[in-house]
């Protein structure tokens, strides 16, 4: 199943029409956010993606950020309209919330990528980040062993304290 705005709208029509997802009380925004997340997960599952990889980061009463594997990829802000909080109808929900995620052509309105391309890019970034972190960890292990060898017969605890002391006193152990 191709991931496009039209397909997403079909899912929204099937899952949300006639259901209560719009309201005026911001204290109930969890209900609204969960409805949006449910639709994303339904959409993801139908597209053969891991539905549990999708979540959101709640940013208080005004917005929630949709996430994929913990990475923010869409802003689902509950935007203000005419100075008042406006949650609106299903149509407003699709147009205002999901336009930041995918537009009618299946491309993100802010970076021109399709929904799938956005997820692929996140996967690539996470993989690259993991590689960088593994390289840093290996470098740190080598530095630790080098310092331990230079200090002689000392415990790992003493080496850690030595490193803390050097860093606290603005010596760079990485030069």
Regions found by a protein language model. Give the residues of each.
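Intrinsically disordered, low-complexity regulatory segments enriched in Ser/Thr/Pro
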Residues: 58-131
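Short acidic DE-rich linear segments
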Residues: 170-175
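A sequence-composition feature that detects small, non-aromatic residues
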Residues: 14, 35, 44-47, 53, ...
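Negatively charged, low-complexity tracts enriched in Asp/Glu with abundant Ser/Thr
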Residues: 3-65
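Mixed-charge, Lys/Arg-enriched low-complexity segments
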Residues: 2-23, 98-164
